């Protein structure tokens, strides 16, 4: 659904007739809209790495749900064709679930977490500044800050009382397009891929037992919204 919405938005931008001049060196762009993180999660099996059962492989895989929040972009045009951009958003929330382990009691919700994915990118706009339609590509670096972790029902039922996950650094890529409705107002559609790798842990502090799972979150991120140029 998200891919279809993004594609339709780009097509609508592409066929519209130019009405206003687009980006120039020194412009400041602010965009806001609905942003969806869709994890393409792959993971290791669940392993006990601390306590009397250390080294035990429980099998299984981790999954994360999608979430939609308010997305924000702040960009500065270094030249007519090159800009620097910061992605921000309100916190995303995900449930980390486990399925397929050798112990049925271990399957289910491992924990929940929130995260912020600030991403700094260099963005290239190939078309002339006079074009109202401005497709672009970009690449940059992401820092995913994970916080507000809570142990899940499946983990707590097995005596685990703590859940946490590591923050992540990774590369990010994006494609998108602006279409100028006026000299200042634009509509925008964009999609990103971000390399997010984390390790989630659950602890049974009373018994000194810990289990972990490595997760390649690697989400596709879709955003559609409006922007304003200063």
Where are these regions (language model features)?
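Outer-membrane beta-barrel translocator domains and adjoining extracellular loop/strand segments
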Residues: 42-49, 95-104, 147-158, 200-208
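Short glycine/proline- and aromatic-enriched beta-strand/turn motifs that initiate or cap beta-hairpins
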Residues: 21-73, 227-229
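Extracellular loop and loop/strand-boundary signature of outer-membrane beta-barrel proteins
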Residues: 56-60, 103-111, 155-163, 208-214
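Short sequence motifs at beta-strands and strand-loop junctions characteristic
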Residues: 62-68, 112-117, 163-170, 214-219
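Transmembrane beta-barrel strand/turn architecture of Gram-negative outer membrane proteins
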Residues: 119-121, 169-179
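Cleavable N-terminal export/targeting peptides
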Residues: 1-26
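Gram-negative (and chloroplast) outer-membrane scaffold detector with strong preference
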Residues: 27, 40, 73-152, 217-230
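Predominantly the C-terminal beta-signal and adjacent terminal strand-loop region
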Residues: 93-97, 182-230
């Amino acid at each position: 659904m998200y891919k279809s919405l993004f594609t339709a938005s780009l097509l609508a931008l592409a066929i519209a007739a130019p009405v206003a001049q687009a980006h120039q060196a020194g412009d400041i762009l602010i965009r806001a809209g609905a942003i969806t993180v869709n994890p393409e999660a792959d993971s290791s099996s669940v392993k006990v790495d601390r306590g009397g059962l250390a080294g035990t492989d429980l099998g299984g895989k981790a999954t994360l749900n999608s979430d939609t929040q308010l997305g924000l972009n702040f960009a500065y045009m270094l030249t007519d064709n090159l800009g620097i951009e910061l992605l921000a958003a309100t916190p995303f929330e995900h449930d980390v679930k486990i399925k397929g382990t050798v112990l049925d009691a271990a399957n289910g919700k491992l924990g929940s977490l929130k995260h912020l994915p600030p991403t700094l990118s260099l963005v290239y706009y190939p078309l002339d500044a006079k074009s109202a339609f401005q497709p672009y590509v970009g690449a940059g670096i992401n820092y995913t800050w994970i916080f507000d972790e809570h142990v899940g029902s499946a983990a707590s039922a097995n005596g685990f009382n703590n859940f946490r996950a590591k923050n992540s650094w990774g590369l990010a890529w994006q494609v998108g397009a602006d279409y100028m409705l006026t000299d200042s107002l634009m509509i925008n559609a964009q999609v990103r891929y971000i390399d997010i790798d984390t390790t989630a842990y659950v602890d049974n502090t009373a018994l000194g037992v810990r289990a972990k799972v490595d997760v390649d979150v690697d989400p596709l991120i879709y955003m559609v919204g409006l922007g304003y140029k200063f």
